[in-house]
């Protein structure tokens, strides 16, 4: 999962199942501006649809992903 920050800010990158339950927290810390890439294997998750949510300061974005095993 790639993301870029235009300024220094607190970042939280979380993964949710289709029922809205948080299944993983990939990032939860203060980051400096720049580009980042986070690996997510999902080894402990079942095949299906998941959502990841990026909270960075006042910016929030949610995207769908498909886990296929």
Named regions from a protein language model:
Residues 1-69:
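C-terminal outer-membrane/trafficking sorting elements
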């Amino acid at each position: 999962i790639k993301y870029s920050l235009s300024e220094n800010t607190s970042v939280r990158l979380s993964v949710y199942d289709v029922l809205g339950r948080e299944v993983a927290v990939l990032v939860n810390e203060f980051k400096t501006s720049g580009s980042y890439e986070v690996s997510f294997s999902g080894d402990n998750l079942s095949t299906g649809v998941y959502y990841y949510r990026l909270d960075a300061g006042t910016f929030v974005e949610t995207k769908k992903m498909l886990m296929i095993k």
